[in-house]
């Protein structure tokens, strides 16, 4: 699919008397995670003249901006300067501001009405149902000030149900989508011992528990090899735990990788050990697109993607022994693993394509006009 190259200045078109809907897609972070990847791909893949997306970050030029530029986009960076952001909104007058980031959404819902008539839409890319301070604050603020937004877009039904308890606004459910579905890899059996995880290193991603499970797996399947891909937000803690648990020969941390296809192509099983705070993980859909079975905890939006025993294995959160047994089961039964991977592959083809994600976003924003 050809990419629409976006510029810093919106192109306003009147086709058939209909003015183009201009959407400022604004990320609070300059880093790149599942939300940044999936929504940026959505915006870059849009070819509907009725809607245009300007990609931007409240942060500075960095990993995400470079990634967008490499894909043909022209991102705007506001360098954490509120005045720069407000000046842009006042000058360019986007029809809608699609905000990804809770704190930034709070700020804009207070200030923006004084300078702009832009619709304010908050993207909630996780299920805010945990006891973390962030989630508690989120629930309180949305209950109190949710009326100042024009709407929400969530990417999991679990998030929609929880948000529905707090606000009366219309909440739109749009799952993530994948653009390129790879042909089924007939050589997966050659990579039967490689287990991959794509997730930034953070507390909620559950890497500490995962290392305990890995120690059990390695004891039963010594030839197994584990790959960790993602930005380190724990200042080397996980790398030190790998050393402390004598897992250096079994676990390799590769940091953030802009291109992940080759790693997925050469893996047999995908594991996402998140403990809480998931919506519709893009990494799971990417794993399915490469015919990988998924092993994860049964939390938040993950069961909406993974069907236990069909295209993956789901376990109670924190059950390290069960997580380890699930991985071992797939490593020792490659036929079962392959069958599950093919089921996941078919699920993505049927229900989680990027074109559908783009269309649903466009339809939503056009309804705001």
PLM feature segments, named:
Residues 293-296, 306:
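Short hydrophobic beta-strand element within catalytic cores of glycosyltransferases
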Residues 265-279, 292:
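Acidic donor-binding loop of glycosyltransferase active sites
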Residues 99-107, 124:
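Short His-centered aromatic/hydrophobic patch
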Residues 25-83, 162-164, 173, 232-235:
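N-terminal strand-loop element at the rim of the active site
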Residues 234-237, 248-257, 263, 313-314:
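Active-site donor-binding acidic/aromatic loop of nucleotide-activated sugar
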Residues 158, 177:
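Carbohydrate-associated surface elements
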Residues 308-309, 313-320, 329-334:
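Conserved acidic donor-binding segment of nucleotide-sugar-dependent glycosyltransferases
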Residues 33-44, 193, 200-216, 233-239, ...:
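A conserved mid-protein helix/loop that constitutes part of the nucleotide-sugar donor-binding site
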């Amino acid at each position: 699919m050809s990419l629409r190259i976006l510029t810093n200045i919106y192109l306003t078109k009147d086709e058939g008397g209909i003015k183009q809907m201009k959407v400022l897609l604004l990320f609070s972070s300059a880093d790149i995670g599942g939300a940044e990847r999936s929504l940026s791909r959505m915006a870059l893949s849009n070819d509907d003249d009725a809607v245009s997306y300007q990609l931007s970050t409240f942060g500075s030029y960095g990993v995400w901006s470079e990634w967008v530029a490499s894909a043909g986009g022209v991102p705007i960076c506001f360098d954490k300067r509120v005045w720069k952001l407000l000046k842009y909104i006042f000058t360019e007058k986007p029809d809608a501001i699609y905000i990804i980031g809770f704190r930034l959404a709070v700020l804009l819902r207070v200030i923006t009405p004084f300078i702009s008539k832009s619709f304010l839409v908050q993207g909630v890319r996780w299920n805010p149902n945990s006891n973390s301070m962030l989630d508690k604050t989120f629930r309180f603020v949305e209950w109190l000030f949710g009326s100042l937004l024009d709407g929400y877009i969530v990417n999991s039904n679990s998030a929609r149900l929880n948000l529905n308890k707090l606000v009366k606004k219309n909440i739109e459910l749009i799952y993530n989508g994948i653009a390129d579905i790879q042909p089924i890899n007939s050589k997966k059996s050659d990579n039967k011992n490689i287990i991959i995880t794509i997730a930034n290193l953070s507390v909620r991603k559950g890497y500490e528990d995962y290392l305990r499970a890995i120690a059990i797996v390695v004891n039963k399947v010594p030839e197994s090899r584990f790959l960790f891909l993602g930005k380190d937000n724990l200042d080397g803690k996980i790398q030190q735990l790998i050393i402390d648990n004598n897992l250096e020969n079994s676990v390799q941390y590769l940091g953030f990788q802009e291109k992940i296809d080759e790693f997925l192509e050469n893996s047999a099983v995908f594991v996402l050990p998140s403990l809480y705070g998931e919506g519709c993980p893009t990494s799971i859909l990417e794993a399915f697109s490469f015919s990988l079975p998924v092993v994860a905890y049964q939390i938040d939006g993950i069961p909406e993607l993974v069907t236990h025993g069909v295209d993956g294995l789901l376990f109670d959160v924190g059950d390290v022994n069960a997580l380890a047994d699930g991985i071992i089961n797939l490593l020792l039964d490659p036929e079962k693993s392959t069958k599950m991977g093919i089921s996941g592959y078919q699920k993505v083809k049927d229900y989680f394509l990027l074109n559908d994600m783009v269309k649903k976003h466009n339809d939503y924003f056009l309804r705001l006009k």
